[in-house]
Amino acid sequence: MFKNYLKISVRNLLNKKGYSLINILGLAIGLATSLLIVLYVLNEWSYDKFHSNSDRIYRVVQTMTSEDRVEEQATTPFRLGPVLDAEFPDHIEKTVRFFDMQEENHTFLNREDQVSFRESNFYFVDSTFFDVFSAELIQGNPSEALKNPLSLVISEDLASKYFGDENPIGQSLSYKGIRDMTVTGVMKSWPEQSHMKIDLVASFTSLNEIYASSPGYDRSWLWNPIWTYILVKDGADTGSLNSQLATLEDKYYRAYSGWPKDESVDIELQPITDIHLTSNRDQEMEVNSSITYIYILLVVAGFILIFACINFMNLSTARSMERSREVGMRKVLGGHKQQLFYQFIGESFLVTLIAIILGIIILIIALPFFNELTAKSITFNPFDNIYTIPGLILLTAFVGLIAGLYPALYLSSFEPVDVLKGNSTRGRKTTIFRKALVTFQFTLSVILIIGTSIVYMQLNFIQDKDLGFDKNFVVMLPTNQNLIAWEFENFKEQSLNHAQIQSVTGLGKIPGSEHTEYYRYVPARNGEGQDALNLVLHVTHDVTETFDLEVIAGRSFSRDFSTDAEKAVLINRKMLSQLDVETPEEALGETIYHYPPSGEREVFTIIGVLEDFNYTSLKKEIEPLILRLVEGTRPILGYIEHTAVEISPGGVTGALEHLEKTWKEVNPIDPFEYRFLDERLAEIYETETTMSALSTSFSILCILIACLGLLGLASYSAQLRKQEIGIRKSLGASVADIVGLLSKDFLVLVGIANIIAWPVSYYLGSKWLENFTYRFDFTASLPLLFLGSGLLIIIIALGTVGYHSVKAALINPVNAIRSE
């Protein structure tokens, strides 16, 4: 019996090659795309789960709250780790601290052959690192590797980069030319699926050597440069531990002498496996993704699969009139309804099986392009995982059942007497159902088109928005505690000798980025008792010229005033609110007190007010900002991390060559590396950019699948109405009349789909845009979005239906009505 069902199914597929191809291709594309999305989602969900104790590892984070600011921080003070060990020994097994010197790049030099590289994935960590995280050592002893000061563990890739085929154990690498570190271990490359990227780790005790001249570097509870992780004991009540963390505020934070009186802190635990998809705090180690986008992608995957199944159901039921006589004859010859059901559902499973195989081939071909688009390294081998093959079998059964159940039930229920007489009205009864399915497809297509357009318009808005400073043709050079910091004026003077280099300045953090620094700067007029943590940017001369910052009152820093380096600050317009003044001019001459963690109060005078600019990313509102000059009598080491060079648009290549030459003359140890500021800022929105590319690609695929179904339906509709078309042409109907007749029904469905999709798209778009403080004028763009998407989907539908409509209209009416 099974052999007979299979033979009939294959024969039916071959007899109707066009419909079979549409069904198989639509399902294959839908399945391949859905599997691709599932692979991406599984990759995102797998972050940090490679640790053997991933269910017991937590990151300790804190939220600082004052009257005018809430700051969610991923980092904590130096001393929090040891305090946690001491305060909660019943809950915590181990703690690990990470510190990156608050620098993006670190230079390591092999003194023997003078090979140096700048590394970004470097941290000082506690010796418990290997006890908490599943970092596998290829060489070295995990219990001893990070025990002593100036010990260094490197990845196997870096071992080859610095030492070639030599054994790296016991060899030295110079850290920034100031300390030699001994390689005590080589670990396997850190997995990609982690919220932290690690290539090198040094012992935390090394900091005592590096900060030997500043013995109190780790005592402040206001300085929060440390990522703190804990391994809770097996069976520990993390809920209870979370609630007990509140006791640390009064006991340690507020007990610190410099703690602002109006500042409160909330400490909480984050499961390490949740960080990548749910955390978006200040000072994250890497740009994280978003669980919202994962849910969106899963919904899109479901939509695509539903689209493909709808196509199958539509085409199967559309052919009901053609197959009704087959059903009638089989029933007259003794066929039972159950047997016919099995035959039709078997055809569905056969189509699905072929589509699965073709879909996997499409998936394998598309995967390299998908990885390039998403910057992933996703692989697919059905034999790598014991669950893959059973999963594909279940998927085949599920899709085959969902896609084929209704057509099988429908076709097997025909009454033989009616269909053999040609009196069956079931074809008409399914019309509403088919139209509903087509409308559903195009509703989702319109939603995807509008959603993709919203993401695209928001990203364009971010890229084009006036940030209040010039980001174009500005080159950023890392300047963190290297020779450039000591020879800054020399480097600047030589750089400016090139005609295409307009200006050079140094600054602590990159404008427009996510990295910020807060210090205790207090307006004097508010009184000694008024505490505040304000955003501070350390700069050198010419910062306003390099970034084209607008001075709206007073003046910028000037070499004509020797006291600027020790006595003067600039503020932005937003800072006026803390000074209780109405105009920028009134702020000039006002006093600002700075209370450093150690040392006496410093007094500064406001010499200028700048127009507000987006110092942080566009996801945040503009905050009060103070610019402090650290050039002149004060060494810039420790304050300036970047050098910004403004280049004339027409001379980029020559200017870069001159910069590289100058760099190597002044600083022969560190490699010359640069980034354009606009490219650097674009990385902040990497997640949104990836989602935009994915949503665009998947929207196109959804529309393609919908069009495949519409193509089949239009073809069958034209075939069913062949005699009607012939009669109409005989009575004088033109080609345009026939095309309009066949297209009208489909265009009505597209119109209904637009009406349904518009309010849904408006709601979803509004919710997504709430993630951005600055966004394009969504309301004003609605007519363009709605009418544009509607027009696009109508053009697509007309193009799809029009081909078969014109083809049907051009048929000789004599041939069309001959059978009548």
Locate each region found by the language model.
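Hydrophobic, regular-secondary-structure patches
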Residues: 44, 53, 58-121, 128-131, ...
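Mid-to-C-terminal secondary-structure elements
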Residues: 125-139, 152-289, 490-687
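Membrane-proximal juxtamembrane linkers immediately C-terminal to transmembrane helices
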Residues: 42-63, 88-90, 136, 179, ...
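Transmembrane alpha-helical interface segments in multi-pass membrane proteins
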Residues: 26, 326-367, 702, 723-766, ...
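Membrane-helix entry/capping segments
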Residues: 1-11, 15, 51, 249-301, ...
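Hydrophobic alpha-helical transmembrane segments of polytopic membrane proteins
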Residues: 388-407, 446, 703, 707, ...
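Hydrophobic alpha-helical transmembrane segments of multi-pass inner-membrane transport and secretion
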Residues: 15-41, 288-325, 353, 433-458, ...
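Alpha-helical transmembrane segments of integral membrane proteins
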Residues: 1-24, 283-286, 315-353, 357, ...
